Amino acid sequence: MCAALVASTVLAVPAWADLKLCNTTTNRVGVAIGYRDTAGGLTTEGWWTLPGQTCETLFKGALPSRYWYVYALDYDGGGEWAGQAYLCTIDKAFTLKSGGDCAKQGYNRTGFFEVDVKQATDWTVRLTDPGEGGGGAK
């Protein structure tokens, strides 16, 4: 009975993790992320600029959401890593707590790709050149 109590207590503790993104290309990329915050609201944030062959932690601490959304733009070579999850962005550094019609709010409608971190205690998204696997298509 004690073992069952300990196990359920351990499972109830929130996992501390960081969301990291690695740019494995040789080009500079701009990155934006989206997620549901602890209150259930939609948050999008950007822009991080990552030089080629570097990694950066985009979110520190307990991940408030199982599903994360990533959009990246190749500043040097053109192209993007995008998907079918449309979220709001703007052209300068931002944190938006919004949803709904991006255009009506004066924002850009941007297609992000979805990342399911499941119950991971640490997660890294890797941006790769076409044909190398990794996060989204360029």
Question: PLM features: what roles do these ranges have?
Answer:
Residues 63-67:
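Extracellular Ig-like/FN3 beta-sandwich strand-entry sites
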